[in-house]
């Protein structure tokens, strides 16, 4: 495909597409558009500082494990309040809940986001600001997602929001090839696809 129409086609990962949205709209959430994206080492450094200031020993919980649990919470679109409500009497998760809350405060104070915030905050913008949602729904009228069986809840919610207006969504996936469950992939996203989109056309090899 050549010409002006082809220039409107964007190929991107979930995260690169969301970074583009955040650079334009993250100020709605109180961040600056020049926000920094922390990598795993940066995040663990902040987690360690939070744990130290909260009096939580690394012998009790490893910063890596805490960060992993927080990442899982973000993949499930659970903010610190949501996570705290769900921990119940689980002592380990109660401790992590305290770290999660402090961690997010420090990220915000540093105008920084971590890898899992990228999709999470984008979904928050699209959910809380109807004008932003409408803008991106019209910007992305046709959406195609590859390896759909490996999407997590946050990615599912993102795609659902963006495709809701025009309903032009194509997904490619095989429920027998899901390999990222350990990273939060939800096989139900593809198994329940036909229930969510009743007018779908199913093409198989």
Question: Model features per residue range: what roles?
Answer:
Residues 16, 149-150, 177:
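Short, glycine/acidic-enriched loop or turn micro-motifs at the edges of active sites
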Residues 1-142, 167, 185-187, 195-198:
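A basic/glycine-biased coupling hinge at the interface between accessory DNA-binding modules
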Residues 138-153, 170:
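SF2 helicase catalytic motif II
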Residues 153-204:
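Conserved RecA-like helicase ATPase core segment
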């Amino acid at each position: 495909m050549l010409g002006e129409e082809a220039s409107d086609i964007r190929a991107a990962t979930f995260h690169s597409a969301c970074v583009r949205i955040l650079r334009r709209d993250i100020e709605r959430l109180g961040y600056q558009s020049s926000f920094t994206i922390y990598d795993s080492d940066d995040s663990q450094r902040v987690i360690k500082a939070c744990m130290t200031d909260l009096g939580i020993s690394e012998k009790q919980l490893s910063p890596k494990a805490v960060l992993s649990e927080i990442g899982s919470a973000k993949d499930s679109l659970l903010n610190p309040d949501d996570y705290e409500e769900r921990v119940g009497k689980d002592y380990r998760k109660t401790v992590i809940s305290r770290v999660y809350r402090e961690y997010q405060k420090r990220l915000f104070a540093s105008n920084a986001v971590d890898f899992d915030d990228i999709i999470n905050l984008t979904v928050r913008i699209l959910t809380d600001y109807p004008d932003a949602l409408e803008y991106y729904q019209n910007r992305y009228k046709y959406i195609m997602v590859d390896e759909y069986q490996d999407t997590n809840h946050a990615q599912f919610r993102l795609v659902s929001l963006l495709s809701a207006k025009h309903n032009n969504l194509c997904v490619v996936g095989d429920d027998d090839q899901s390999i990222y469950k350990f990273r939060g992939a939800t096989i139900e996203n593809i198994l329940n696809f036909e229930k969510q989109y009743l007018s779908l056309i199913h093409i198989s090899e």
